[in-house]
Amino acid sequence: MRRLETLESILERLRMSIKKNGLKNSKQREEVVSVLYRSGTHLSPEEITHSIRQKDKNTSISSVYRILNFLEKENFICVLETSKSGRRYEIAAKEHHDHIICLHCGKIIEFADPEIEHRQNEVVKKYQAKLISHDMKMFVWCKECQESDD
């Protein structure tokens, strides 16, 4: 999915958010955001920690979890719960998209479908509601898992 913001712009917003919350600036927070931005995919806390440890051996998994909680609360990242691979994170500054999640291997596929978006808006209109947000996840067995199960 196309990015809606540059990494530098996100980091600048992060610095303002840290200041607004009365926290000290932390290179680790910026590094977590950078790892997620550059990955372009959904990462687990362990994968994020491993990536950061390539530069900073002192990074702990507990610090990464605390940072992820803060980033989620401040809407810098989105969390995706999968039964197979646990919580996975992605940068929030992307075009709207939905997810297909394989229940067998945990693979995550991002997609955008204008017809589905249109239909969701029609449903909202039918009930005279105001759509604030939505998050669609379809749980499947991916092609590879279907083939390996045969």
UniProtKB/Swiss-Prot annotation:
- Report residue spans for region: Dimerization: 94-150
Q: Example GO molecular function term?
A: DNA-binding transcription factor activity
In the record, biological process GO terms are: negative regulation of DNA-templated transcription; negative regulation of siderophore biosynthetic process; regulation of DNA-templated transcription
Keywords for this entry?
Cytoplasm, DNA-binding, Iron, Metal-binding, Repressor, Transcription, Transcription regulation, Zinc
Region ranges (DNA-binding): 1-93
**Residues the entry annotates as binding Zn(2+):** H42, E90, H99, C102, C105, E110
User: Where in or outside the cell is it found?
Assistant: Cytoplasm
Q: Which family does it belong to?
A: Belongs to the Fur family.
Quaternary data = Homodimer.
Described by its record, this protein's role is as follows: Acts as a global negative controlling element, employing Fe(2+) as a cofactor to bind the operator of the repressed genes.
> What name has this protein been given in UniProt?
Ferric uptake regulation protein
Q: Which organism is it from?
A: Helicobacter pylori (strain J99 / ATCC 700824) (Campylobacter pylori J99)
